[in-house]
Design a protein with these regions (language model features):
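Charge-dense, helix-prone N-terminal extensions
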Residues: 1-130
């Protein structure tokens, strides 16, 4: 399925005061980044914002369901992304408010991940001046 270009443009326009929105295509949708931090996915013409333990109650209070995927074998998997409230599609302030929460969740998630093991560095080059 193609990415909803109109929705993508709206997100970029609405969030311009907060930073630059970029994307990475994935399985018929796109992962969205705000200044390099994952904050949402676009899937089937809808925006799903990143959530976490700290923000789940806010999403629940708005009635924003959790993103789920049903596999061919019938298994269902959920991810901690929440359907955007209806006002994010036409009110820049609403888009900004919910995107800020999602970016904060993205930053907390990134901080919790273990850092990758670094590769052993090469021996210093004695001919290279610093």
């Amino acid at each position: 399925m193609a990415i909803d270009e109109g929705l993508l443009e709206w997100v970029k326009e609405a969030l311009e005061p907060l930073g630059a929105v970029s994307l990475r295509k994935m399985m018929g949708g796109a992962t969205l980044y705000l200044d390099g931090t994952v904050f949402a996915i676009l899937h089937e013409g809808e925006i799903w914002f990143k959530a976490d333990e700290e923000t789940n109650a806010l999403w629940d209070a708005e009635g924003c369901e959790r993103f789920s995927v049903t596999f061919k074998d019938g298994r269902v998997d959920t991810m901690n992304y929440r359907r955007g409230p209806t006002d994010v599609y036409d009110e820049p302030e609403a888009m900004q408010r919910w995107a800020r929460l999602a970016v904060e969740a993205g930053l907390r998630g990134a901080a919790k991940r273990k850092p990758r093991k670094s590769r052993p560095s090469a021996e210093p080059n004695p001919n290279h001046s610093t």
